Structure formats: C-alpha cells, structure tokens
Amino acid sequence: MQFRLVASAMNVRAEAMEPPVPQQAPAETCMTAQTRLSRWGRGLARGALIATALAACSPKAATTETTEDAVLDATNDVEVGVDAPADATAADVFDVSGVHPRLMFTKEHKAIIVARQNKPPFDAMWQRLRDQAAATPVAPTPGTWDSGLWSQYAFAAQANAILAWALDDAAAGAKAKQLLLALQDNLEDNDDLDLDIHIPGVLLPYANAWDLLQATPWITADEAKQAQKQLASVTRKFVAKNLDDSFMRMVSFIFTQNNHPLRAASSIGYIALAFPDDPDATRWLDWATDQMDYLLGPKGHYVQSDGGVVEGPFYFSFGFGAVVPFLLALDRNSPADAVHHHTCITRNDVDPWDDNGCVEGEAFTLKNPLRDPTFLSTLDWSIALRRPSGVRAVLNDTHVAVTNGAALLTSLGGANYLLWDWATNAVLPYDTQKFQDLTAWYLGLVADVTPAPPPWRNRFFPAAGHATFRSGWGTDDLWLMLVADHGPARKSLHNHADGASFALSAYGEDLLIDTGYYKPDSMQNPLTTDSPSHNVILVDGVGAPKRGLLNTWGDTDAFLENTHDGEMVAWAEGRIAYEKAEIRRGIAFARKRYFVVADRIQSEVATPRTFQWRAHLWAGFDVGGTYTLAGNRLTIDRQHGGLLIAATTTAGDPTFVEPPFKPLKPPHVHDTDGSGNHAVADATISAVAPGFLVVLAPFKEGATEDDGPLTVTAVTAGAASGAWTIDGATAGTKWRDVAWLRDANAGSTLTLADGHTLETDAAFVLVAESGAYALIAGGTHLTLDGKSLIANNAAPVAVFGP
C-alpha cells in the first residue's frame, strides 16, 4: 500500500489507495488530528483532541486485542513486504547456529572487556555498568506499559547479564534472568505516540541480556524460550500498532523519513537477528534492511551525496544511536550476500521522495552502511560541524548533540579521529549515553588506537549546503558555519528557514548563534524555525518564506557555491533569493584569525527598502556577557572571548539597532541547551540594493598581540563601494589586510591612507597589503601598486598565494 500525501499550511490529508480512512470518523476529524500532529519532533501532540482523533481514525490504535492469536491476526491484516519463498528458511538470511553471544558481543570480546575493568576511561564505564546492575526498578503499574520503565528493566538485565557472562557472577546471572522474565507484553496499554523512537531502549538491551545469558549456566533452555516469547510478543504488538496500522504508519514513518523509521527499524531488525526462528523474523528483517538501504542510501535523500544529513546533527545522532547497534549485529550475523525484499508501505510519494522507485517485494542485497563510504562520510560531516567545545553545531531542530557511537566504528577500521572526537569533547567527554545508552558496547568495541584530530580543517558540503571554517581543533580555536541548503537537503521535518545564515565561536565562547529548538507548542513548528530567528538579511523585516507544517515545506532554496580552501584564506558563498532580492553571501576566513562577510545584493525593486543585517548575539538578557552598540560597530564581551563586528555597505554606513523585545518570543528567544532570551542587533540601512561588508574580528579577553583585538579601520572608498583595513599580528609579525566591496558602477581604484593602491573589476577583494595573498570574487583581475596579483580570471572566485 502506498500513500499520496498532500500537505498544506493548515490542512493535511492522506489519500490511501487502500484501505480508505475508516468511516467511523468524519474526514474532518482525521485531518484535524493530522494537522495538529504538526512537524513530528520533540514533544509530540498528546492532548485529548489527538487521542480522540486517533481513536476515531484508527480503531486498532485505540482498542487492541490482547491475545497472541489476535495480535497475529492483526499483523496479517496488512501485508508488509512479501512472504518468504516456500523453500526459504531463516538460515538463508542469517546465522541460526545457536551460538551465544552473537549480538552485542562474541566470545572473543570477553577478554577485552575483562581487561578494561581498571583501565581509564573504561573503568568509569565499568562502574556505570555495576550501578545499572545494582538498580532495582519499581514494579509496573497494572494497566500501563511504560517504555521508560521497561527500559530501566532492560538495561539492568543487560548489565547483570554482562557481569554474569564476563565475570562468572552467579548472583548477577540470577538477577538478569529475573529481570528478563519480568517483561510484560501488554503493549496495548501504551499510549505513547513517541513509542517508535523509544522502543530501542527496551528491545535492544533486553535482546542482549537474552543473548548473553545463554552463554552462561544461569538460564535454562525453557526459560530462554519463555523470555524469547515475551520479547517477540512485545515486538509483534509494536509492529501491529506502529507499522501495520495505517494511521500510525503515516504519522510515524511516512511523513517523517528520518530518525523515526530508522530507530524503529533498527529495533525490530535487532529482534529478527536475535530470533531467526520466529515466524515474523524474515518480515521484520526485510523492513529493517529496506529502511537502512533506502534512508541511508542514495534514494532516500536522508544522507546527501557529500555525507550531510538533512535533519541536522541532533536528530542524526539520535537515530545513529540505535542504527549502529543494529548494523554491527547485522554485520556479524548476516552474510553480505543475504537476500532481502523491499517493503514499500512506508515510502512517501511527495517531493522530495517522489522518485523513490520502490517495487514491493523486489529482492536486494544490503551493503552494510557501516562499510559504505557515503554513510561513513556522515561522520566526517558530523565532526566538521563540531564546535570548538566538542558539541555539534546548532542547526535546524537542535539541542546539545554529540554522535554517540561513532567511536565504536574503530572496531571496523574507522578513522582514529572518531576516537579523538569522543575523548576530547569539553562538554561531554567519553560520552556513552547521549540519545542511547551504549556504555556496554564501548567496553568491547573501541579499538586500541591512538586518537588524533582530523587531518583537515575547513570542509564544504555543497549537496547538504554546509560550509565550516576553523583555525584548528582546540577549544580556543575559531569556528564558523555557513548554511545554504537546497532541494532535498532542506526538505525535512526538522529543517529551518535558515538559508545563508551562519554561527561563530572563538576563544572558548559561542559569540553569534543559531537560536535552536524552542517549541512551546508541540502542535506547531518551533518558534525558532523561521528567518528572523537566524543570522540573515531581512528586507523590510521579511526573510525567506515561512516553513510549513509536515510536508508543506515553505522556505526557499539556497545554494552553497564557489568554495575555496587555502592556508591563508578560505571562502564560500551562499546564494538565496526572496522578497525580490537575490543575496549572494560570501564569507572569507583570513589568516585563521578573522572573517569577512561580503553580501552582494541585486534587487528587482527600484525604490529604497529597509535592509537589516541581523546578528543573534550570545550576550545579554539570560545568557551573560555584555554587548555594546556604537553606530555601525558592535562589540560582544564574554568571560574568555569577544567579538568586534564592523559593518559598512555600498550605500553608506548602516546603524546597529535592536528590534523590539518580548520575552520568549522571536527573535530574542532561543533554546540550545535550555530556553531563554539573548540580544539581537540589526545593521540597518534604507537603500535600493546595499551590499554589506562586515568584518567579524574575534579576540581573546585580556590578550594582546596575536590574540588581542584587531584594529578595523574604515577606508574612504567612494560611491557604490565600502572598504576596511584590518591590522593584526601573527607570531609577533604585524600585518595589514584590505577588504573591499564594490557595486558594478563603482570606481575601479582604491587608494589607501598609506599610499598603497588597488585596481580591480571584482565585486569583492580581500588582499594582504604586503601582497602575500589575495582573493577576488566576481571579477577578472587585481593589481596592488601596479603589480598584477590575479589576471585573466574567468572563475567566480580566484586566489593568489597559499
């Protein structure tokens, strides 16, 4: 069965070829429920209206029969995948040898795990494991099935099973068995609309406990079969409720195409690997491997060709925590040439997924993504988005994020910088619990390799629309990220209208921010979704079109173009058009010391309008630090580092002003690690098409010379142009650079106060007064004091020097 989804701003409907929306509920009720579900993200809609609508639209979701036979009947109501060939057995798909353990660990891991009991950082993980094993979860409340509570049971069972297996601990074995057999399968009593993303915390550790205990003398074959029956029953009921039910399938998996199906598929696929003799194992594994093949492959548009992930680092990492355990278990339990079958019922047929080409039941072999270069490039992307503190960039719907589980891939030969990234995070060092508790996995699956930072600094991801600049990999280094996403890369439920926005950190401080994920109403988009909540240019107070609900994308495309990576200067452009203006935002990173933002604007409107160069400051109100506005300059001071912003335009100097403030309302509200208010300032000017030339000069508080404040001085540039000189020092050697932005009708010569002369036809110039390096954009040549630095250039950007 396939759904054609038609979404509009306030009216979302799903047209099913079969079955139609049940007649028990008026169509309006179902549409209201679907609309109110909003963009499926943090804090799903849970009100009485939703519960009522769900019950009306989906009788199965409201009343589920509780017998095993009834669950099997319900499961068979909807065909998922295809029946296995008559002569097929589970052994044709994966290992059914009965060897234990084989999911999280194999017998070869035992010596490694035991040897790490007193070895940092694993000693702390061992202690965490013992603490989990000592926990005694409360008894479940009759008539409920709480995934959070059963997750506590599952992790306690897993921890005790590891102690029993690794240390021959009989008491731990007895407790693990008790917790394993305690699992109840009354999933029909669960009313959590987020169960699809919470279920990994139950199924994975419980399956590991079952697997490990069977490598000990402390569980009998009959007890293992009883535990398997309960765990398989929970899985079967979960599949019936979330995958087979047409309404829940739509809102959980079809609309989303993101971490929701990835986490759910990883969970039921893991159970299929654990119980290959289960009658539904092949069916479960077909859907699980189909989702890995589709969403993590080229057709699903979730992972872009350069490794960028459409929903950003937060939800990518959230999904990753469940995906990696499944793929690791699949790698050791399924042969590379195993045949699976595509399952199309969770495909979405609207843009950008209307090219999915899914054929129900089509046979395929899965190249495990853990061995696929494109999927592995997501980890380079994630590390490129690493801020100096170690946590990931605030991008799209994001709070504090790290990619927990990436270091495990060193066991498969993954790069040593995956281990470095895990070990050197200043906020969450050696984290094993963010999004999914993988503590036990780290004990056996982190390779003994020497950690080292990546061999690269700046990275550009044009398909994803992300550019990152950094001076190095230390906590005091400079970092900036530019966003310019288009097409499938911006068409995801967690995306924001943030084309051509950027964020900046330096000297141990965040200075210019993305406002994050403030969502006080779970039935609506976050208040921080749209353009005014980002560092963009507003035209008469308006930015890119607002985001829509669900699969009504809104927003507009932006394009990352004309990138250059160099030792002295790096460059990237983000191009976007809205409000009858095309904005080409270029960002130069010079000397690993400062940034220049050069915004070239073309307007279809011949009369002046108000242009606002917006900056979200990590200062003021609830976030500490101070800021000062002084005409066309702005200074931020925080404990360790600060930032000078100096702005001019090709139409004269703008003035920094603050927009009206309303607590916890855009543009001042943020939620990056807790909600609050921050300062916002707009460099404002009225003109037809004022090109902005803005110097971003970070400094270390209290420092002089290299890391102290740079001297940024205005240059008289003539009509239709603006210019700055920037003075600083590197290793005690002083230098001066010139930044110059020109409209097409500007003069071609710039004479500096000290007598140096530049001549160009370029729209933007950044050049060392010494002639050590130069960059031009939108031009053919540049001379300095009559000496040609760049000539006969036909490319959008050209660089002289390293």
Task: Name each model-derived stretch.
Residues 102, 110, 117, 121-376, ...:
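Aromatic-lined, polymer-binding surfaces characteristic
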Residues 395-406, 511-530, 535:
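Aromatic/acidic polysaccharide-binding cleft in carbohydrate-active enzymes
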Residues 318-511, 564, 685-689, 712-716, ...:
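Carbohydrate-active enzyme catalytic cores, enriched for enzymes
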Residues 30-48:
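Bacterial N-terminal signal peptides that target proteins for export
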